[in-house]
């Protein structure tokens, strides 16, 4: 009889002492938009050796109409050019989104949470899509390096702060 449950009188005190852990669930993920152009095949561009590959990454996050749900998107723009002449070999644009249920994250931490943790969770799928599309397009698979989303977030915050300081103040 010593294993019987209590009537719950001690439960509220225990809950106050325990920190509430954030909840993050991926509800869905999908390709919102994608474009791949094999320019080398269209124009007959010949390139020997490793191409010069440029990858641009943009992140976007917005609240959905459903409570505690957010949509986070990774937008990639990848261009491969020959090192010798700079001729375009291929171009890939990918807009990949995830729908997330997020709970127990303080408001002041939500912005970095959305632009760091959520992209980190869906990035492996983005990497695979890029690899598959470049391979299916007739090139060796392009395996993207891991993206440091913390550094990307900090760069964006610094860029916004610099832009805000550079903007002339409106005096009336």
Curated annotation (Swiss-Prot):
Q: Which SUPFAM superfamilies match?
A: SecB-like
| Alphabetized GO MF terms | unfolded protein binding
Q: Which InterPro entries match?
A: SecB, SecB-like_sf
Query: A Pfam family in this protein?
Result: SecB
**Where is this protein found?**
Cytoplasm
Give the GO cellular component terms, alphabetically: cytoplasm
For the keyword Oxidoreductase, the answer is no
Q: What is its main location?
A: cytoplasm
Q: In Gene Ontology terms, what is a biological process of this protein?
A: protein transport
UniProt keyword list: Chaperone, Cytoplasm, Protein transport, Translocation, Transport
Quaternary structure, per UniProt, is: Homotetramer, a dimer of dimers. One homotetramer interacts with 1 SecA dimer.
Q: Which family does it belong to?
A: Belongs to the SecB family.
**HAMAP family recorded:** SecB
Q: Briefly, what is this protein's role?
A: One of the proteins required for the normal export of preproteins out of the cell cytoplasm. It is a molecular chaperone that binds to a subset of precursor proteins, maintaining them in a translocation-competent state. It also specifically binds to its receptor SecA.
**What is this protein's record name?**
Protein-export protein SecB
Lineage per the UniProt record? Bacteria, Pseudomonadati, Pseudomonadota, Alphaproteobacteria, Rhodobacterales
């Amino acid at each position: 009889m010593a294993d019987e449950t209590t009537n719950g009188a001690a439960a509220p005190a225990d809950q106050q002492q325990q920190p509430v852990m954030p909840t993050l669930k991926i509800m869905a993920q999908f390709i919102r938009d994608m474009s791949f152009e094999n320019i080398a095949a269209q124009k007959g561009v010949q390139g020997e050796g490793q191409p010069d590959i440029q990858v641009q990454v943009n992140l976007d996050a917005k609240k959905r109409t459903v409570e505690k749900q957010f949509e986070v998107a990774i937008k990639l723009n990848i261009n491969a050019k020959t090192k010798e002449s700079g001729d375009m070999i291929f171009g890939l644009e990918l807009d990949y989104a995830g729908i997330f249920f997020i709970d127990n994250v303080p408001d002041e931490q939500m912005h970095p949470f959305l632009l760091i943790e959520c992209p980190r969770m869906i990035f492996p799928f983005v990497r695979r899509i890029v690899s598959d599309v470049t391979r299916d397009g007739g090139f060796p698979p392009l395996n993207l390096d891991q993206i440091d989303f913390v550094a990307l977030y900090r760069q964006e915050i610094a860029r916004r702060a610099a832009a805000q300081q550079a903007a002339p103040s409106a005096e009336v």
